[in-house]
Design a protein with these regions (language model features):
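Active-site T/S-Asp motif of two-component receiver
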Residues: 50-51
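Acidic, metal-coordinating helix/loop segments flanking the phosphotransfer/catalytic sites
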Residues: 29-47
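Two-component/phosphorelay signaling modules centered on CheY-like receiver
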Residues: 10-28
Length: 122
């Protein structure tokens, strides 16, 4: 599986890239929401993982833009700062929200669940 990881913090990008590679996934990275949208290819990326709070476009804006373009690619928003209102908006866009810090096992389980549900149309 190939993932697109969008986060403005280099250390966080490195950590989640390592998580994804440990799980056997290939990873493309983007340093902000605009770059993430430019790099996103629904024919290449089976999942998008995005931070919530980034300069320019938030992760929520990225997710809403992807959905507005008609794409159903699974999206996981990883946040330490999203409000409950933000989380509700994300869930309405079909986005799975994970709160930082997140243990590796919980991240792996959530990622597997999101991808499995996308594959079954649920």
């Amino acid at each position: 599986m190939k993932a697109l990881l969008i986060d403005d913090e280099p250390l966080i990008r490195d950590i989640f890239t390592q998580f994804l590679e440990l799980l056997g996934h290939e990873v493309d990275v983007a340093a902000d929401g605009r770059e993430g949208l430019a790099r996103f290819d629904p024919l290449v990326h089976q999942v998008v993982l995005t931070d919530f709070l980034m300069p320019g476009l938030t992760g929520l804006a990225v997710a809403e833009t992807i959905r507005a373009r008609g794409h159903t690619t699974p999206i996981v928003m990883i946040s330490g700062s999203a409000t409950l209102r933000d989380e509700r908006r994300a869930m309405q866009a079909g986005v799975r929200v994970l709160r930082k810090p997140i243990p590796f096992a919980q991240f792996a389980a959530a990622l597997a669940e999101v991808v499995e549900h996308a594959g079954t149309g649920q």
